[in-house]
């Protein structure tokens, strides 16, 4: 036993050192930063009585792979050799890469499996099996069997691993040299190490505020943030630039600012350099400091990242995650906060930065106590373009922002110093829901029969009030894209000869048009999937957009057919729609016709797919949020040069196939995960596609009907909607709400209360706030309230009229 444990301990130590030294910290590296590891090895050469090993049947064997002993698995052992161990809180926020390898000698190809079971709170949260047949060479010949997979942090902490060989086929075989590894890792940071500047000695107060003060060094030309008693809160602020100029990447950081204006409540600083000039305007108002930053470039540049770097002197953060959840301890190393924020706690007060007015995103490097306020960031707006070329599947990466000479990028945000409080955060979904499910259908290869089947339940049903199944029956709205017309007389025959007629378009099928109007009148979002199957003409594009505006008034658009060819729908967002020199330039026509919420295929199409390594167990959410918050995945995207549009994306196409697939991929446990992570899941699908395998329909008794699996899944979603957990909604409704909350002014008052002002021209319906403490509205304004699914927070929701101001009170 002692020799066995020595071998285990030695290997664990060696592997731990190896992986600790093998970490990385580059912004865009996809390697995983391993913090520690566990390694267990057994070769069965000694009697090993450690309780973590299970069902060891040790025998001497002259054909052992190594040494003289092996572990025997016999037909009477349903549960053969295995290992049990616990994972406690000491792993922090780390994930784990699990790998197992063993040598196997079998008389035949095995049906047995190695099972990994993880339990938490006396409940099995993961059961996964791996075939022992992998690697088989020949009978009675040793072969290596191995596998590995990543396990997210939300499954690891305080969990129990129960791993074993499941010999349910009653087979005989031997194993030797079994090795089990858990290598802990954090997500890649997507933040480069920035320089920290020492605090200069010659500081003077250039603000003299009763709340937040600004300290300036004349010698070093550096600026810092302090409280009303001049206690320093930050190290010197700096600007970080990552630019592409004439094909070369330039990175620089500068903390020197010239003080150009200094008066009570208003300060102007200038940071000049060869490439740009950055003006920092700072205005104090009560307990708030408003930062306005403008960087003007002296030559054409592509911006990869432009950030104001704020290094703090302590790390007692309250972090308002993008989910939205709150972390106030047990932090991750790095957070991508999207448009959320954080508070820094000290003494009896806190410094707040939440719901910024106009920033691209916020990243918080907790490990280095540094905030990156991104004026612009490549990953906030991934965008590809299929240029017109004599090839296929070739795209250029247009994610970096192109800024012309003498043009500028502007940003603004507010920081406040207040009493300790629990800030109410703005929910990404209205009416008090914790999460949302958005169905977006692409119009390809459809027939009126398959439309009626998947929306009304059967091909025979013509009126929505008679629906027996499908989306309309369960009142699950869809953003449904359509073709306007069919000038090329495209038929469905090539996809399915059972549907030889024209594919569905508005102008070629009056019954289809009537079907769409019924959906429109019941809350469905009907938009263009481009005007036609192939590249359209400018006249047809104008006609289609005008018709859709008049009849459906959808602000949405879903690209179709994108690729490099001349027929590949050049009017697409990811083709020529944003190229003002192209005859297929579409941006101005979108604006004229109220189209502003566009599908961005880049997250599906770019190779390698961003963050593809962080998929887990066929969960709908990709990347899986349980791995952590460092990945820069924004809820929505905006483009600097095209301010009138907002982009949304999908991670993949949802094609469950047979009915069993529906009950697997959209099982209750996977839908529950969407709520648990307060996630907005947007799916790309083809319900009426004329091929039964890909479509959401099947044939019963000679009739086309909605698949049973689809109906079961929609019923589960409908029940979760009725429980006020998961809201089925359209792109139009979701994006409108996102636009409205972007225009919602959020100010934290000195006593910790919050003032909201609706700067929209329309009422925000069902504006939802969440907090760990109960909230109320001043002046006895009515509101709704419920507790979250986990019973740990409160959600309130209410309507807010244009220009209305509301005071939110928190019961601290």
Please report, for each region that a protein language model flagged, where it lies by residue.
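Active-site beta->alpha N-cap acidic-glycine motif
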Residues: 416-518, 522-525, 530-534, 540-546, ...
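Polysaccharide-binding surfaces and accessory modules of carbohydrate-active proteins
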Residues: 30-31, 189-200, 290-361
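Extracellular and organelle-lumenal recognition/adhesion modules and their flexible linkers in secreted
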Residues: 24-202
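Acidic-aromatic substrate-binding/catalytic surfaces of carbohydrate-active enzymes
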Residues: 123, 194-275, 456-463, 474
